[in-house]
Amino acid sequence: GLLSAVKGVLKGAGKNVAGSLMDKLKCKLFGGC
């Protein structure tokens, strides 16, 4: 239903945010900017 669709979108957005944060962290740690 609608609720599960919303949950799926939120999960996807959370993964995207976490991924970009990890990229920034790696960038700072390893100087790969």
Swiss-Prot record:
Tissue specificity remark: Expressed by the skin glands.
Its Gene Ontology biological processes? defense response to bacterium
Major subcellular site:
secreted
Q: Which cysteines are joined by disulfide bonds?
A: 27-33
An example of a Pfam family matching this protein is Antimicrobial_2
Q: What UniProt keywords are attached to this protein's entry? A: Amphibian defense peptide, Antibiotic, Antimicrobial, Disulfide bond, Secreted
- GO cellular component annotations, sorted alphabetically? extracellular region
Where is this chain's protein located in or outside the cell?
Answer: Secreted
Could you tell me what this protein does? Antimicrobial peptide.
Entry's family note? Belongs to the frog skin active peptide (FSAP) family. Brevinin subfamily.
In Swiss-Prot or TrEMBL terms, this protein is called Brevinin-2DYa
State the organism of origin.
Rana dybowskii
